[in-house]
Amino acid sequence: DRKLVMLEPGKKKWTLTFENKPSETADLVILANGGMSKVRKFVTDTEVEETGTFNIQADIHQPEINCPGFFQLCNGNRLMASHQGNLLFANPNNNGALHFGISFKTPDEWKNQTQVDFQNRNSVVDFLLKEFSDWDERYKELIHTTLSFVGLATRIFPLEKPWKSKRPLPITMIGDAAHLMPPFAGQGVNSGLMDALILSDNLTNGKFNSIEEAIEN
């Protein structure tokens, strides 16, 4: 429930400064705030890279009522379909909602600025209906039914460059902050959970003489 605005190393502890909240100190900082984290610089200088793929994501609540045709097409299973450069993935059982994502090669004219206004539902609907003009009507039902969309450029972190071995104080990263990857098949989520499991075990199993050794392992 706090927004971190500054992270500073002190003599023995980190100082965390929060927006409109008291500052705190910590012996160890674990970065788990996503691929666009501004404090990754303490661990690595590697910059985010664009993959050239763009994703549009959305959720439809009560899909059995709001988009029954597409919901029945899923038949209780996850669905994936591709055609002419567009890939659609749908999960009809996402905590009571139908979650779907559409991936495609980023158009050249989007390189500097996305040409679809994601604050304007009609702008997104018009774009998608044009892209899906020759798809089955049940896919178009999905688009027509959606109330809001989120647009995300797909980004990754190149893994060739090692993390900094000399850090001012104990600090490490897990999840997307550590290894951002395209959002397919749940691999990013699974990797993040495994990161957390391994790190928590290293910090508590008593096998290491210091925090630095635990996070290095």
Predicted regions and their residues:
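Alpha-helix boundary/capping residues
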Residues: 46, 135, 146-149, 203
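Conserved mid-domain beta->alpha element of the FAD-binding
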Residues: 30-31, 148-217
